[in-house]
Amino acid sequence: MTLEEKIGQKLMLSFRSGWTMRDGTKISSVQTINDEIHEIIGEYDIGSVILFAANFNSDAKVNVELTDGLQKAAMDKDLGKNSIPLLIATDQEGGIVYRLTGGTALPGNMALGASGNTENAVKAGNIIGSELNAVGVNVNFAPDADVNNNPNNPVIGLRSFSSNPQLAAKFVSAYIEGVQSNNVATAAKHFPGHGNVATDSHTGLPSVPATKEELYKTELVPFQAAIDAGTDMVMTAHIQFPNIVTEEIYSDKKDELISKEKVVRIWD
């Protein structure tokens, strides 16, 4: 691959409401692929696309037509040189983070964790995975592997399985099993831990004063379980950890926990 092709493969694009086409036309919602999207994906060898709620339709057939069109664009040999199938992703955690219109409304992670039965997480993951697979989505940015150890956290809360690292770890593993049984990849998030914050990282930059040793005892426990369970990716958090150097965690766990090749970073 050329450098340009490698860059394209590392990019994950979103086509959402408010998107402006090259001719100045504004699109209110992108639920069908158009010629311009086809050209962008094919010409620049784009590797991934993320879909949000605005991209999904209550009619599953419309969703399938969208994902099928995206894949055809990626495989268009008249535009791109590689013709590599796309990763098509979404955030379908269950509970309050729910993108797939028409999908099954499931209890959130906190409710699953409170049940004490990891089989509930397997079943939830299986339902989510089967529905994503049915509409052509092959990556689920889930499970949320954060430990809910700050009651003032404005963005995680119900999305976490538990404030207990060991319990959260068991449910993270179970959820991964369910999703992956449907040939859908998982991405445990938000590494190295988004639970102990009091600021929403979508609107500010949280700072976590934990030391590396403290992270290994608490926040990293569910992520270790996720890796052991075979998660396909890990999504990083956009959070400050002033008492550690993130590279140390990558270095310490290069083979055991996480490799940079499987890290997903999100810019919105």
Placement of each model-derived feature along the sequence:
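A cross-family glycoside hydrolase active-site/sugar-binding cleft signature
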Residues: 14, 50-52, 89-91, 142-143, ...
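A substrate-binding/cap region within the structured catalytic cores of diverse enzymes
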Residues: 85, 113-137, 142-166, 172, ...
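N-terminal hydrophobic targeting/anchoring segments and the immediately downstream early-domain regions
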Residues: 1-99
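Second-shell residues forming the walls of enzyme active-site clefts
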Residues: 2, 25-28, 33, 59-75, ...
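Flexible glycine-/small-residue-enriched beta->alpha junction loops
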Residues: 99-103, 107-113
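Short, acidic/polar
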Residues: 22-42, 121-131, 215-222
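Loop/turn elements at helix/coil->beta-strand transitions in domains of secreted/extracellular proteins
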Residues: 3-10, 44-49, 82-86, 133-139, ...
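Solvent-exposed loop/turn segments at secondary-structure junctions
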Residues: 17-20, 54-58, 92-97, 139, ...
